[in-house]
Amino acid sequence: MYSIETDNLTKKYKNKTVVDNLNLKIKDGELFALLGTNGAGKTTTIKMLTGLVKPTKGKIKILNLDLENNSQKIKTMLNISPQETAIAPNLTVKENLEFFAGVYQIKDRNEKIEKLVKDFKLEKVIDEKAKKLSGGWQRRLSIALALINGPKILFLDEPTLGLDVIARKELWHIVEKLKGKITIILTTHYMEEAEALSDRIGIMKNGRVIVTGTAKSLMKQAKASTFEDAFVKIVTGEEL
């Protein structure tokens, strides 16, 4: 079964086509990395998939439900961990978790919070105010908050942007543990991140997904020794 399916998904702003007849299928439990240079259409695509922007034309199915006719139900099945960490800076880590659990009216909230604290290893910072946390800890908390309502689909937007190498690798380990449990759509500018984490990668150019495949298959297609080189060749057309 597919978590996400699009059929000729298109978005135009006046005379400019930002997303152009996009056809995409993402499997249940898959970690799918959506890559592309700035202006390729990634952000608009994500906004349409999450119901924040209405398509000019085309269809979106989320968990086999038509998004246009089931938007409220679908919004309870997905969540977003945005590029800018979605945390309350003046609340402690525990208070953030309790607050978001209340917003989502989570049943058995104490049990849910305890599990997230354990999974994200937040014990040592549980009573720290969020604004005093390092970037890495803030990212952990932000992703934990995005999971508190038990979504079936999680959108991770630049989850390790601005983090040092150690904090980035630690967050990778956490994301890897989520693989197979929920569907994850990852957007990132770090090629090594997409290569390390993704089951499959889609590369966008001019509003279209021009290739999909594993990092290894795309490297082979582009005749490149690294995935970063493969990405450059694909988006510039050098491998064609």
Regions found by a protein language model. Give the residues of each.
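Conserved ABC ATPase signature
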Residues: 90, 129-136
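Conserved ABC ATPase "signature" region
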Residues: 98, 102-125
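ABC ATPase "signature
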Residues: 212-213
